[in-house]
Curated annotation (Swiss-Prot):
ATP binds at L59, G60, K61, G62, T63, Y64, G65, K66, V67, K81. Stress-activated kinase involved in tolerance to glucose starvation. Induces cell-cell detachment by increasing F-actin conversion to G-actin. Expression is induced by CD95 or TNF-alpha, via NF-kappa-B. Protects cells from CD95-mediated apoptosis and is required for the increased motility and invasiveness of CD95-activated tumor cells. Phosphorylates LATS1 and LATS2. Plays a key role in neural tube closure during embryonic development through LATS2 phosphorylation and regulation of the nuclear localization of YAP1 a critical downstream regulatory target in the Hippo signaling pathway. GO terms for biological process: actin cytoskeleton organization; apoptotic process; cellular response to glucose starvation; negative regulation of apoptotic process; protein localization to nucleus; protein phosphorylation; regulation of hippo signaling. This is NUAK family SNF1-like kinase 2. It comes from Homo sapiens (Human). The active site is at D175. Pfam families: Pkinase. Its EC number is 2.7.11.1. The modification Phosphoserine is found at S435, S523, S544, S547, S573.
Length: 628
């Protein structure tokens, strides 16, 4: 198997003073935080990994493989994610995996899961990641129901520090949720799962509508283009609400109610007032131009209360939780001067949904709901065209669909992880319309929430397709994309024994160029042409759980470097975002849907069982006419 190793780019070794200078300046003071520099380099020696790791337990499962806790020969605990290439459905999934590896290996932050090594051979990709021993934040809050304000501030500061660092490097996460926020042995935050992340550019819009329903911003649920950071800001508002109040801010039991609440910024009235309510209101502003940015959050007085410095700088909390100098008071005064805009006129109406939607006599306190990521469509609609198209014709032929509800109840026990699918995205950057005042037309709304699946692990979440391989029948997902524009299915023969799929130059700009043209996929060095289906060397069921590394040999590679301003693909079309009101077409675009046998053929009596269908039908009409 080939391995991707994270080695520094060759060149002159910087002095100790040069290395210490950016670290002393801190993340916030540095205009562009340093990212790890890596280059693709092929090693010609093999690596046998069987004796390097001792597998201990399974942390998560996905369609592509598993995530296992393992111990290196040095004694260090790691999380090993194995991806079987024969499970990769198409090139979009492949590009999705590669993007996650490239972005996560380029980011270097204490509160972001680090990738140590990536190994690859003809049948597997093995990613060795940092191990977070205390699980995810969802389980942590589930066990405690509600955190103290001091603990909530501690977690939120670390989350903000990591997301702020990503935004300074033009990376938007787009899937911030409790399930993707892990805790290490020391109780520190580790953000995982960058499968839906992307690069963004000021002056360009992203056309990808993805994420998780209860954390999705108004732009996402209404199908409007967005720059990028504002969707993370909204998700941070939802996370802060949960950390402070211990409940979800929006009602996820009915997708119509959820869309209405998010669109109006009408979150539940908190059961108990908190000093963080002002920041929550600012983060949950419907208007993205008035929504708090990560810079605003990092300098907010509530976030920095009890700390000598703001988020990202050298932190030294004081005893008793009160600032020991005038720095916090000065920061608060500065924030009050900058935020003199009327927060109560932001359109985020704090409505009491306990009174409006609570069942009579029942408990109205909502619990947390585990979220699955939104899927991405196989092909992106042209945003420039959709912004000027008339949506009346689109909505006229879409039949209604009954509401799809999530199960009610408080926090559920953790079960085996099942990853949700995502499809890789076409280029999603589009220029801002010439007339900024012209609002984009609303897109046809479709269902948001679907049947829930098993819980996800932060190690195994967004990049994985659903267990069944269905495109439109997975749980807790938005599905968007015009079926008529979907690509024809790839020959399954392309999925067998593909070599070196992570060995391309690895530039983000290359990804968009490759996917813009119709190509097959296999090795990223040289995409293989289609070939007929060949029998696998052994059936998939014969692969043992402990055979992730087995006795195979691995080649070792370096990860690609990060290029500035690379155009990336989008992941979901605009046309199909907020609902699922029309049945998917059965054309060639629906290649990932599970085949289902026609129920008529299995019924006790069906016209398909008759020899003369026309005669039987006419006889039935005559009987009906006599009865009437």
């Amino acid at each position: 198997m080939e391995s991707l190793v994270f080695a520094r780019r060759s060149g002159p070794t910087p002095s100790a003073a040069e290395l210490a200078r950016p670290l002393a300046e801190g993340l916030i003071k540095s205009p562009k935080p340093l990212m790890k520099k890596q280059a693709v380099k092929r090693h010609h020696h093999k690596h046998n990994l069987r004796h390097r790791y001792e597998f201990l337990e399974t942390l998560g499962k996905g369609t592509y493989g598993k995530v296992k806790k393992a111990r290196e020969s040095s004694g260090r605990l790691v999380a090993i994610k194995s991806i079987r290439k024969d499970k990769i459905k198409d090139e979009q999934d492949l590009m999705h995996i590669r993007r996650e590896i490239e972005i996560m290996s380029s980011l270097n932050h204490p509160h972001i899961i680090a990738i140590h090594e990536v190994f690859e051979n003809s049948s597997k990709i093995v990613i060795v990641m940092e191990y977070a021993s205390r699980g995810d934040l969802y389980d942590y809050i589930s066990e405690r129901q509600q955190l103290s304000e001091r603990e909530a501030r501690h977690f939120f500061r670390q989350i903000v520090s990591a997301v702020h660092y990503c935004h300074q490097n033009r990376v938007v996460h787009r899937d911030l949720k409790l399930e993707n926020i892990l805790l290490d042995a020391n109780g520190n935050i580790k953000i995982a799962d960058f499968g839906l992340s992307n690069l963004y550019h000021q002056g360009k819009f992203l056309q990808t509508f993805c994420g998780s329903p209860l954390y999705a911003s108004p732009e996402i649920v209404n199908g409007k283009p967005y720059t990028g950071p504002e969707v993370d800001s909204w998700s941070l508002g939802v996370l802060l609400y949960i950390l402070v109040h211990g409940t979800m801010p929006f009602d996820g039991h009915d997708h119509k109610i959820l869309v209405k609440q998010i669109s109006n910024g009408a979150y539940r009235e908190p059961p108990k007032p908190s000093d963080a309510c002002g920041l929550i209101r600012w983060l949950l502003m419907v208007n993205p131009t008035r929504r708090a940015t990560l810079e605003d959050v990092a300098s907010h007085w509530w976030v920095n209360w009890g700390y000598a410095t703001r988020v990202g700088e050298q932190e030294a909390p004081h005893e008793g939780g009160h600032p020991g100098s005038d720095s916090a008071r000065a920061s608060m005064a500065d924030w009050l001067r900058r935020s003199s805009r009327p927060l109560l006129e932001n359109g985020a109406k704090v409505c009491s949904f306990f009174k409006q939607h609570a069942p009579g006599g029942g408990s109205t306190t909502p619990g947390l709901e585990r979220q699955h990521s939104l899927k991405k469509s196989r092909k992106e609609n042209d945003m420039a065209q959709s912004l000027h198209s008339d949506t009346a014709d689109d909505t006229a032929h879409r039949p209604g669909k009954s509401n799809l509800k999530l199960p009610k109840g408080i926090l559920k026990k953790k079960v085996s992880a099942s990853a949700e699918g995502v499809q890789e995205d076409p280029p999603e950057l589009s220029p801002i319309p010439a007339s900024p005042g012209q609002a984009a037309p609303l897109l046809p709304k479709k269902g948001i929430l679907k049947k829930p699946r098993q819980r996800e692990s932060g190690y195994y979440s967004s990049p994985e397709p659903s267990e069944s391989g269905e495109l439109l029948d997975a749980g807790d997902v938005f599905v968007s994309g015009d079926p008529k524009e979907q690509k024809p299915p790839q020959a399954s023969g392309l999925l067998l024994h593909r070599k070196g799929i992570l060995k391309l130059n690895g530039k983000f700009s290359q990804t968009a160029l490759e996917l813009a043209a119709p190509t097959t996929f296999g090795s990223l060095d040289e995409l293989a042409p289609p070939r007929p289906l060949a029998r696998a060397s052994r059936p998939s069921g014969a692969v043992s759980e402990d055979s992730i590394l087995s006795s195979e040999s691995f080649d070792q590679l370096d990860l690609p470097e990060r290029l500035p301003e690379p155009p990336l693909r989008g992941c979901v079309s605009v046309d199909n975002l907020t609902g699922l009101e029309e049945p998917p077409s059965e054309g060639p675009g629906s290649c990932l849907r599970r085949w289902r046998q026609d129920p008529l053929g299995d019924s006790c009596f069906s016209l398909t069982d008759c020899q003369e269908v026309t005669a039987t039908y006419r006889q039935a009409l005559r009987v009906c006419s006599k009865l009437t």
